Amino acid sequence: MDKTVHNLPSLGFPLFQTSLVTGSQIDDLKRGIGISDDHCDPIAWINNAVAYGQKLVSVKAGWGELPTGFVAFDMMSRRELQGEEWVAKCSYNLHGVFVNPALRGKGHGRALRRTISDIIEANVQTIQDRGFADKVEIFFEAECITADGATFVRALVSDCEKMIEKMSERRSADDTFRIVFKNCIDYGDYDNEAGFSAPAP
């Protein structure tokens, strides 16, 4: 995925662009999120993503010059034989998500969630189309340290579950390919769903 444009008509314009961040775009991302403290968590997440080869996806509204938010995550896949069937184990570990505080509640987080869901769907579809496995197990991991982050993760898990349900509905009756979603989320102090009042990033 180089660049994805998401049109969210229910939220009105502008469109949202999400793209994988390359080394030359790191400084623009740091400026765009509105954080100047090099020791804060969002900057650390960006630096760690670069240092450890994590996926770093940015988002910006309309055709603006600077990205204004991002999500950093690891994506790993392996295949193993269990009994008489091949199982693909796909792990997604969310390390950080952040949107410029002045722009929250406008749809940036939704665009980032949709992009991650699209990436997972494309990965599963490739495994199925190429016959790599009879079954896919998706492991989604995250540790929530803020209410906004927990809200984002909860919505992302819901998006992924709906995506997997739709993929399952599209299969023919004689298709034995299976998808299993395993939620390994640590919501910490934000485990009470009724306690969420802050808008998602």
Predicted regions located by residue number:
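A short glycine-leucine-enriched loop at secondary-structure breakpoints
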Residues: 106-111
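Non-catalytic substrate-recognition and accessory regions of acyl/acetyltransferase enzymes
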Residues: 1-103, 114-139, 144-201
